[in-house]
Swiss-Prot record:
The gene is hisI. It comes from Pseudomonas putida (strain ATCC 47054 / DSM 6125 / CFBP 8728 / NCIMB 11950 / KT2440). Binds 1 Mg(2+) ion per subunit. Binds 1 zinc ion per subunit. Mg(2+) binds at D77, D79, D81. Pfam families: PRA-CH. It comes from the Bacteria. It is an enzyme of class 3 (hydrolase). Homodimer. The keyword Magnesium applies. Transmembrane segments: none annotated. InterPro entries: PRA-CH, PRib_AMP_CycHydrolase_dom, PRib_AMP_CycHydrolase_sf. This is Phosphoribosyl-AMP cyclohydrolase.
Length: 130
């Protein structure tokens, strides 16, 4: 039997883009990267675990903020090169800016307009004890 992780077309860095969506509304919350280990751990632990390219290590979503993403479903696209995670976003904040989604800007009249409010000050999110 073929390993399910072998079916994924990893990029030259051994990564695959992963899009987190709210499992109830379908809203796109964020995009991050996963490597083989982070995807396997995500499936095993039923929570989103990404690969931080800037830190060069596993990133358990919510480990600092408390805003864990509980996994409901994993999906692989037709080309096998993008993952979608259907998640329950604990705390309703996915973005490090304190917003529900990282996609809070809309292109309008030649510029990016902020359309989603900050739900919690990022300084308060990432301080001790969240």
């Amino acid at each position: 039997m073929k390993d399910w992780l072998d079916e994924i077309k990893w990029n030259s860095d051994g990564l695959v883009p992963a899009i987190a969506q709210d499992h109830k509304t379908g809203r796109v919350l964020m995009m991050a990267w996963m490597n083989r280990e982070s995807l396997a751990l995500t499936a095993a632990e039923q929570r989103a675990i990404y690969w931080s390219r800037s830190r060069g290590k596993l990133w358990r979503k919510g480990e600092e903020s408390g805003h864990v993403q509980k996994l409901h479903e994993l999906r692989l696209d037709c080309d096998a090169d993008v993952i979608i995670l259907m998640v329950e976003q604990l705390g309703h904040i996915a973005c490090h800016t304190g917003r529900e989604s990282c996609f809070y800007r809309v292109y309008e009249d030649g510029q990016w307009k902020i359309v989603d409010p900050v739900l919690k000050d990022p300084d308060a999110i990432y301080s001790a004890g969240h």
